[in-house]
């Protein structure tokens, strides 16, 4: 697994709520690494590092290299980030160990490109995104950061399906998802509600004026 994003972490001696609170008082985020048929490892990391990854996007399918001083690096996925209910600051992170040659479930995001070239959108159609993510199984060495949906050739009423996505080589759809499932579509243009209401009001006013005694007929 080459080109992993490295995150600097520190080991923690104790687990539990009290130890986690103490870690937060030190300005760090408590975290755990589980899986791989090993005992969980209790770690901590800089909250700015996690926030950077959350804002970067694609973190749910990105394999990280967790590097602690004096320990072997660990390849892992972020499985859960708990956020403070008021500040949205990260307060705990769950990592899962991964190894090449195994299959893991991940949610991979979809990047939509070519919207400005779509004939349907040029004619007033609207992009209707059904899925922003797809659940797949993949070897950690082959997890894409995103799939690509090409919109440049789509007209009104055309769809993008799983089989149309680029970057799906080497991955398998998660259970319960069909290969012909719709990812996005170009919907027909709709009449602006305000314009429609204004036209109706104008027509009603003209009809009322025409019905008044003495009104001139055109």
From Swiss-Prot:
The keyword RNA-binding applies. InterPro entries: Rbsml_bL25/Gln-tRNA_synth_N, Ribosomal_bL25/Gln-tRNA_synth, Ribosomal_bL25_b-dom, Ribosomal_bL25_C, Ribosomal_bL25_long, Ribosomal_L25_dom, Ribosomal_uL5_bac-type. Gene3D superfamilies: Ribosomal protein L25, beta domain, Ribosomal Protein L25, Chain P. GO terms for molecular function: 5S rRNA binding; structural constituent of ribosome. CDD domains: Ribosomal_L25_TL5_CTC. Pfam families: Ribosomal_L25p, Ribosomal_TL5_C. This is one of the proteins that binds to the 5S RNA in the ribosome where it forms part of the central protuberance. This is Large ribosomal subunit protein bL25. It comes from Gluconobacter oxydans (strain 621H) (Gluconobacter suboxydans).
